[in-house]
Amino acid sequence: MLQQKLNKLKDGLNTFSSKSVVCARSKLFDKRPTRRPRCWRKLSEIDKKFHVCRHVDTFLDLCGGPGEFANYTMSLNPLCKAYGVTLTNNSVCVYKPTVRKRKNFTTITGPDKSGDVFDKNVVFEISIKCGNACDLVLADGSVDVNGRENEQERLNFDLIMCETQLILICLRPGGNCVLKVFDAFEHETIQMLNKFVNHFEKWVLYKPPSSRPANSERYLICFNKLVRPYCNNYVNELEKQFEKYYRIQLKNLNKLINLLKI
């Protein structure tokens, strides 16, 4: 029922022009301008609440271009070893020069320089450089779903699964991660996330204040990677936490559409 309501509202947004939606969204949800980019602010808010980016010696930034998650983490840990992987054939995704040129930042792109985490050669290079070595892995990847918002969960499934596998390869025991997720209505999505969180002592689903409340973006924050995973069933708890954010999103989508109708 919640899924149907959300999909109907998302479809409703498509009846308005992109310019109108952007203006209404900014009016409703954007706070006064700040000098920090939104992605920086999101990780800063996550860190202030959960303290995952402090005292980091080595971290990996997955699908992180243009690099604000990496930038924030390096600002707190100026002497750390930082690794980043992002697509190089998309100008939106590449790391900006202020990140790329940092002496302690290494970009992993694979032999063909693609930076594609689905490429086995890129995965191999990541595992060689970062395997079992990272205190923190950040995974902020997403697939462009413009015009196909109701398919966002399905379109991002493979990427999120790939990121979870790389997180488990690269985190040392005791390490933490921040993983962007979207909806989890489908059985395969919730089962994938259930299997993943069993590798950690604790986990929580969170939407930072700078993440626009009408979208489906949330972050799964996992603490203290285990040497041996649990065999717990967290499906009900995952569904409960997701439902809380579905209801918040529903409320804010209604606000957005009501404003657009004026």
Curated annotation (Swiss-Prot):
Residues 34-226 form the RrmJ-type SAM-dependent 2'-O-MTase domain. It is an enzyme of class 2 (transferase). One of its GO terms (molecular function) is mRNA (nucleoside-2'-O-)-methyltransferase activity. S-adenosyl-L-methionine binds at G67, D140. The active site is at K180. This is Cap-specific mRNA (nucleoside-2'-O-)-methyltransferase. S-adenosyl-L-methionine-dependent methyltransferase that mediates mRNA cap 2'-O-ribose methylation to the 5'-cap structure of late viral transcripts. SUPFAM superfamilies: S-adenosyl-L-methionine-dependent methyltransferases (SSF53335). It comes from Autographa californica nuclear polyhedrosis virus. It catalyses: a 5'-end (N(7)-methyl 5'-triphosphoguanosine)-ribonucleoside in mRNA + S-adenosyl-L-methionine = a 5'-end (N(7)-methyl 5'-triphosphoguanosine)-(2'-O-methyl-ribonucleoside) in mRNA + S-adenosyl-L-homocysteine + H(+). PROSITE patterns: SAM_MT_RRMJ. Its EC number is 2.1.1.57. InterPro entries: mRNA_Cap_2O-Ribose_MeTrfase, RNA_MeTrfase_FtsJ_dom, RrmJ-type_MeTrfase, SAM-dependent_MTases_sf.
